[in-house]
Amino acid sequence: GQNIYPDRQMLLFAQDVLARVPGGTIVFDVKCSQRLAPAIRAAGGVALMYKTGHSLIKAKMRELDAPLGGEMSGHIFFKERWFGFDDGSYAGARLLEILSRAPNAAAVLEALPDSFSTPELNVACAEGEPHRLVAELQALADFAAPAQVNTIDGLRVDWPDGFGLIRASNTTPVLVLRFEGQTAAALARIEAELLALLRR
């Protein structure tokens, strides 16, 4: 078997919710897979990447009247047919509902687009250092096209074949890193580029 991480589960939840709420905005955090936004748009929704933090995602959902939001950490918020707060048991029930409609539940999960990715990596720092380091990295970031830089929450750099993220944790003095590539080689290249920037 394999772990189906929450950002991949969000692909299923978004498709399901958007079938009933066409054009809805789906909010997700900067740690989520690069494959999520295109899947949301393909299902007729609006994809909005936002800052990590369950209270921040929930507030943005309220602001935009979004029917669904989620984080890579596993906080999933359903406003469509529910109350808009994160509820693990309810998210599990919604996943079972989706799988129960398919003749082969395993095939539904196997069909989800996959990538090569790291889990969330934490680098311990002195108190106050993570935010200072991230501000320096944002100032140093100078990536050539086709790279796209996003500084809404740390430094996320997207390439056509993957992304890298360095951000400061909201709760502890650590840098949070995550890397994803569509191939193992892309993952290694992206990780090397971001770590080289971090070592400057």
What are the functions of these language-model segments?
Residues 9-12, 52:
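A general alpha-helical scaffold signature found inside nucleotide-binding enzyme cores
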